């Protein structure tokens, strides 16, 4: 049971988180499980480039594990996002490719070249009821994701790249001390789990006021085995995520095996 719980959240999902760089699934999925977006759809094409550095936790930002690069391009209503995790030798350790249409998630694909695994997510209309949306998740060995099984799209479903817009949509509630729940996609378990965001502190860092927001599993059983993700966010608009501690996409080699990685991810906003 412990091993099952320790592995249920995969690299590209909790931290997925991710490199949680923070720009997300259609910002928020409506409670009726349709693929709804903000009144004004979030612009996933901005910024065109975002970078980050992933450090070993506890190294005082000295031990670099990976660098992160997110690029976005727009063609009419379609936005293509590519998120690369680059090893210290310059090789690409993992890549995530995401497609949005009019601010709504269409597809997500992850390839982890070191561990030789891949996964994919699709949001599509239910053939039997096109007014409702389906979530199709696949994951397996090899660099080509296998076919996935469809299920109803849960309300407020979030992936790595959609966490930031979801957080923005609920910013006022978070600042009032309310916990905001959502469903986070776990590729390797091919399902979603319920998580919540909650503000835990406010302090001054590098001459600016920041908020500390914790992402944690709602289930006590799951939370016992999964460390929370700790986000440090600008208090002032646009509330950029400056850094986070927790699970990220590329793995780290321990002995002969590639293990899931918790790291400190620091974003470089220009």
Which residues fall in each region the model found?
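Compositionally biased, intrinsically disordered low-complexity segments enriched
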Residues: 15, 135-136, 214
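Acidic, serine/threonine-rich low-complexity disordered tracts
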Residues: 31-103, 108-126, 181-270
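Bacterial N-terminal signal peptides
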Residues: 11-26
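Solvent-exposed helix/loop surface patches that form functional interfaces
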Residues: 45-47, 132-210
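N-terminal secretory signal peptides that target proteins for export/translocation
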Residues: 1-9
